[in-house]
């Protein structure tokens, strides 16, 4: 991708990280996750008696507190009691565990921490652009934060639907508030930012690999254009071709030809004669020697005469031999 595309992706990642962290922080810190009808209890102590006044009104609650919206105790907030004294948890251990997780709110808090760390990684990737693993770490943090967020939302819904202190009519008369939707929106944005950050890392990794391959190709082509390298390569190719070609020195000689009739042992082959080694070593070309040539001609003529005489004798013998 081009520089403009990378800039747009980085801008979207930064804005998304800030939005996801802000939405989740607001959702965890506010008390508008659920609207339902409940009882606001107050306890007043006088000199002689303790009076309790119970009133069923519309309430809004968050992860830790419940606040009254109407009645005499409008605006009054109290801590949520996830383990009331009149409830029996021995019969259902799963419900007790669910209430414990709901009371701790560990998953929403963990989501906020992971979103914060992912935002730090995105900010660090702007200053350390050569370290591409930072943006990958940011993507992993955001994906993990989204998963932790959705687990916390599921636990909250399950705990609210299975609350035994509420009657069936009260369980059906509730609605989720804007804090709940902020948390759900934070989950969606966190997952999108995580996927985008991982995509940016993969894109940058591909560009680095393509650049490295192009550099290696240019270096290799530059080496092949060096004259000394080409000369060594040509010499090596020539030597290898010479070693693979068959030798024709023996086949070209008259002695090695199949069916060649060699001269008799009494005759001297002209091919075996060589020049004088002393003269051949001292002079580049052989000089004419009349004495040696005359003796050579005399010897050659004698050999021819002897061969003719032996030939006539053999013919006479053949004629006189009775059949």
UniProtKB/Swiss-Prot annotation:
Q: Which organism is it from?
A: Mus musculus
Q: Does the keyword Calcium apply?
A: yes
List the transmembrane segments: 10-30, 104-124, 134-154, 182-202
Pfam families, alphabetized: PMP22_Claudin
**Outcome of residue 321 to A?**
Abolishes phosphorylation
User: MF terms per GO, please?
Assistant: ionotropic glutamate receptor binding; voltage-gated calcium channel activity
Can you say where in the cell this protein is located? Membrane; Synapse, Synaptosome
Gene symbol here is: Cacng2
Q: Tell me what this protein is called.
A: Voltage-dependent calcium channel gamma-2 subunit
Gene3D superfamilies in UniProt: 1.20.140.150
Major subcellular location class: membrane
Gene Ontology annotations of biological process type:
eye blink reflex; membrane depolarization; membrane hyperpolarization; nervous system process; neuromuscular junction development; neurotransmitter receptor localization to postsynaptic specialization membrane; positive regulation of protein localization to basolateral plasma membrane; postsynaptic neurotransmitter receptor diffusion trapping
Output the lineage of the source organism. Eukaryota, Metazoa, Chordata, Craniata, Vertebrata
**What does its PTM field state?**
Phosphorylation of Thr-321 by PKA impairs interaction with DLG1 and DLG4.
